[in-house]
């Protein structure tokens, strides 16, 4: 048989796992406690006849415990669903707790009132649009804050520079007009640039107009080979004609050597110019006709 006084002596004075000690009063965190206070009348363990109101998924239920079901722990509490209408719920409590103490009925009604207010407030908050809360990492938040701070400093610096420039313009530090407003200065600069461009084009035209002389040694070699071949087939001429021809050939050879020396010098100079200027090359060939030199007829016998 259950003894309420014995249970309270153990639970109330010695030890209870549901008790929370406070400075002025102790509290109870048992889910079936109707007031939340730790005392003899409110303790659900030390009272064999007990009633309370609980909320489950937005619905209110009346829980009742009697001494007849104390030996069935699975059937210890009887649950009755209460109406959503507050007035009807109060009537249900009065009907179910008709022969119960008045203090117990009053406490159940108080708990019903508190839970009803709580549910109404929760429904109102659910209807309102609330911003979604996104967790932010502390490092990322610190990084973004530092970036914002640097951006503000840069913006203030730009504004200060702008203000300083406006003050200088108003005070006349740059004269009547700043440099980028006066058109005459820009016209002078453009004219100077155009003059430089024209001079560069004239220099390029001069480089292109310069001629380059190149000697043709192959023709001279062919002529000498022809003379040797003809000399082998010819008859011996008179000594006077040979002396005249030898003197003329020596003079011609001297002239050819002088021409070759000059041409080589020109080649070296022109090669240096061409490396520097990179102008196009123009080849000119000169043919020299010798009137005094007679080439005898060639007779072939095949």
UniProtKB/Swiss-Prot annotation:
Cross-referenced InterPro entries: Mak16, Ribosomal_eL28/Mak16
Compositionally biased residues, Acidic residues: 198-230, 239-258
Originating organism: Schizosaccharomyces pombe (strain 972 / ATCC 24843) (Fission yeast)
Basic and acidic residues bias spans: 282-294
Keywords: Cell cycle, Cytoplasm, Nucleus
Compartment(s): Cytoplasm; Nucleus
Protein name: Protein mak16
Motif placement: Nuclear localization signal: 138-143, 274-282
This protein's encoding gene: mak16
Region entry Disordered, spans: 198-302
Family under the similarity heading: Belongs to the MAK16 family.
Gene Ontology terms describing biological process: assembly of large subunit precursor of preribosome; maturation of 5.8S rRNA; maturation of LSU-rRNA
GO cellular component terms, A-Z: cytosol; nucleolus; nucleus; preribosome; preribosome, large subunit precursor
